[in-house]
Amino acid sequence: PKGNMEDYDVAMSRAVEHFKTQGVTRFIFGDIFLHDVRKYREQQLSPHGIEIVEPLWGKSSEEVMNDFLVSGFRTVVVTTMADGLGADAIGREIDRGFIASLPAGVDPNGENGEYHTFCYDGPIFRQPVPFRLGRSFSQSYDIRLDDGTVKTYSYWFADLQALNTNSDAGTGPASE
């Protein structure tokens, strides 16, 4: 979680060029309704000849979450906005109980950046991804807005650690 938007842009450009050499012409994103995010992605990727595909675009947040909850995928919260869900949500499994616990005004999918997840199991996985949640930590970022002002955003992160399946036991959101 180090760096800034310029670092992100450079990393994304490198990744795009890597995938283009493998014949990739489209990137698929799970955005639902944030026009500024979609515009950013299009501006970032169209110069590289990459088409943006948004299969969830325009669906209701409730429909998307209900589809997810019955899909068989398993995810865990790994990032939250510090002034929103905070550290307490780190490590929580996305399930009906989690969704019911969200404060009023929080998008059930975290579409406004309230939270981000790591998907570790589901119907397309041969086996669950073995991992452990290490200690949570906080990080702040200064982001330059379109009007030139700088705003500080603070987040909580899980220290997500891969487990060696040959020597480490467990799969899923085990915590230290």
What residues fall within each predicted segment?
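Nucleotide-activated chemistry modules centered on ATP-dependent adenylation/adenylyltransferase
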Residues: 1-176
